[in-house]
Amino acid sequence: MVKHCIDQFCVFGNPINHTQSPYIHSLFSKQTGIVYEYSARLVPFKEFNSYVLNFFLNKGKGANITVPFKENAYVISNNLTIRAKMSRAVNTFKKLHNNKILGDNTDGIGVLHDLKRIKFIKSKFNRVLLIGAGGAARGIIFSLLSYGCSIVVLNRTITRALQLVEDFKNVGSISIFKEKFASNYSFNLIINATTINICQNSNLSTIKSLIHKDVYCYDINYSIKHKYTEFLLWCIKNGAICVSNGIGMLVSQAAHSFYLWYGILPETNSIICKLNRQFYML
């Protein structure tokens, strides 16, 4: 009797007990009919490299990487996709036929996929205010610029925002937010890519006047307890009507990891709806 090896995948992180990835991938497996195993692995902070090496030596086919290891994953990848190079972070590994490890970043394409799904982006000519200039912001800029969005970066530390503009200026239209010209700005979409508590974010008072019923507000963060993050509640309080948390991004970036591994893009809407029902009784 021939024994078939089941493809092995996992997500590396620390902490990892909160991850929804194994559940999401179990739904991808049912949807596509592709049988594979996907587990969550807690990695000690200083042992990421050895854990990854052992996983791929033991027939691992691919993996996802979450905080705080995305930059480590970027460093140890043998090959990188263009979006991983631009992001300087990797959230997806794929083992190639020559046993080399390809590093990719599906965060940006995941955000873009979800924004198109919920119609927060309806054309290629979108004016986006991006709040934050850290790793999360860097991870999504390339895909948005490549699609044709123009981006203005708002960050507490201007030097970090300036660095992002410098790094991505050849990809598309990107600039820093200038407070003295705040009243001159007009945006279709505002994206929060920072985890800073809104009470500690002095930038928000600057953009208060830019929020109204026709501006879409999107937070890449999410909570399994509350549908609306603090940022989204603040947006609603200041006049926003169309808001969304990061559940859709979570599922969509996972779908694009699956696409990298198998060449098939799972349908995401039904899975996002299922998670919303489970988390928020919707």
Curated annotation (Swiss-Prot):
CDD domains: NAD_bind_Shikimate_DH (cd01065). Shikimate binds at residues 19-21, 66, 91, 107. The keyword Nucleotide-binding does not apply. GO terms for biological process: amino acid biosynthetic process; aromatic amino acid family biosynthetic process; chorismate biosynthetic process; shikimate metabolic process. Belongs to the shikimate dehydrogenase family. HAMAP family: Shikimate_DH_AroE. Homodimer. This is Shikimate dehydrogenase (NADP(+)). It comes from Buchnera aphidicola subsp. Baizongia pistaciae (strain Bp).
